[in-house]
Amino acid sequence: MPKWLIVLLAIASLAGVIVLEQTREPFPAVTPVMNTQAPTATPPATVPTVPQTASSAVGAPALPLPETTRPQTPSEIPSAPQTPSTAAAPSSVENPWAGLPLAEFLNRAAGELVRLSPETVTFLGLGTELGVRDDHLDPLTAEWEAEYYAIEQAIVDHLATYDLARETAEDRLNAEIYRASLASDLAGRSFTDNGYGVSSYMDSYPTYIEWFLTSLHPLETLENAEDYVARLAEIPARFRELEARLQQSEAIHAVPPRFMLEIAVEQLRATGSQPIEGSGLYATLRDALATIADATEETTRALLGSAEQVIADEVLPSYLELAEFVAAMAARANDDAGVWKQDSGADYYAYCLASQTTTDLSADEIYDLGLAEVERIQTEIRTAAATLGFDSALSMPELFGRLAEETGTSLGEDTIARCQALIDDIVPRVSSAFLRMPTQHLVVVDGGSDIYFSPGTLDGSRPGQFFAPTLVPQPIYGLPTVTYHEAVPGHGFQSAVAYEADIPPYIAGMSFTSFSEGWALYAERLAWEEGAYDENPYGNLGRLQDELFRAVRLVVDPGLHAKRWAYEQAVEYMVNNTGLDEPYVRSEVERYIVTPGQAVTYKVGMLRILDLRERAKAELGDTFSLPEFHDIVLGHGELPLDLLERLIDEYIAEHQG
């Protein structure tokens, strides 16, 4: 998929742990190894000029890939064309990394990549530290993408000059983690037009960019407000670049199903037709200016006037223009749901599975694993439900429908209060399972209709946040599991450990979905093992339903993309086998359509962590320590699963010795 979409997905999904310790040595200023200034974004003269490409700090998860595409060593990664603008520097005069110790090189190279993406700099809260203002959006051009890959290739080429066997174990591991992430990105160069830039799902670029500006762009100073208006002014140019990329994607049949494009058209038209006062882009700035201490009446009026003009004359019309472009695409589209319809669709899906799971599992293997897990978990659910008086012959929809009726629902502030109480209860329960309990602050906030965890910024100005759903009634039996998954001991806990661990910034910023989501699903089970459900058997059924939900994904994702399932077939299978309501399932299947491979990471990662734990238990017997095991898992930041397995094997060998 295009590099801009990888960055978009990583930021928008908030799946990666993007946290660095404030007291660490900052990324050093570096001289770019090549000229990477994109022609599409020219900062004002008063703003430091920065290269406008993407950052691997929030890139796609790492390899291994299937044997047909997986580079085994850095030397096997296809070399970038050796032109003056893309060639790795051949001499110390041209290569500022020459002669650097490994750790310093990695820190400098990673810092350079971070500063190349304005949106990533904002997400990490590194603008002040890097001397980069938050006044640009990442370009979406093929040129921007090519420059990014060239920088990444140069880093891989230089990394290959080090003899890792001579480095410390810590530096060697960090280099392997970083190389894995870069290798995954570079392997994706063959699929730069396969991703979906516009759809009805939340990762659609127009939806993402509004969310990014209204949720992540800092608005605490007048300079922040000026930067916000500058970014608003870039939206029309980004939409024109998006249209060019969509044309390239359509040429290889990389187009979402017609119905998803038709919904996207409605969304774009609604946004473009709204009055200024109803625009979230305008309201965000207006509300923020009311809280900025040095925002006088005059400056407020001037900034709002500028924003109003930009939104009315440029931004909203660009939404309407894009809507007509997408409407024409929809008229040419069909209803096929999977990426199998794309040119090289099978290879693209194999890449998605490998990069997302960091394993070499094939689509068929994942599908068969899913069928087996669905059968196993449904049997466990029926057994547990029978002890509560439920008929074991009930279907999943019937069983969980009755469970919801018996336990009731929560809404609004009640949901927030319940989630906070669950966190207060689980922290002391799981403390004995860890060597270190993080101190980073975590807050439960109003998530509207959404449920997710967002890491805090690097400067501590925004704490980790668990967004609890308040607008949609939530089955009470399911609240414990979602809280443990998103907060403690799941995403919030894992991200806080990474924040406080003594690991380099370029590692703390890595994102491997199979690790983070695998840990969060494992955390649900860990809460059960630590007694969180002992007095809440209904909640335990919610936990099992959640695990079943993730197992069903193992069937549906390859069903759609490898076995040519229709959209309705996927919806029907999921409703019948999870007991989840149909509207929610439809939104889930739409997600799987446009993010191939991501949905399988939860169960794949959880099963790998459990397998490694059982291996360590079997090998170490009475000397096995659960807190030590968890410290190995969490103490190095996010990892590709093959490297995690190696760490556990080394831990076992060390303790046996």
Task: Please annotate each region the language model reported.
Residues M1-P28:
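Sec-dependent N-terminal signal peptides
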Residues L8, L20, T49, L63, ...:
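Intrinsically disordered, low-complexity, compositionally biased regions/tails
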Residues T23-E94:
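Ser/Thr-rich, Proline-interspersed low-complexity disordered segments
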Residues P78, P84, P90-G657:
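N-terminal maturation segment of proteins
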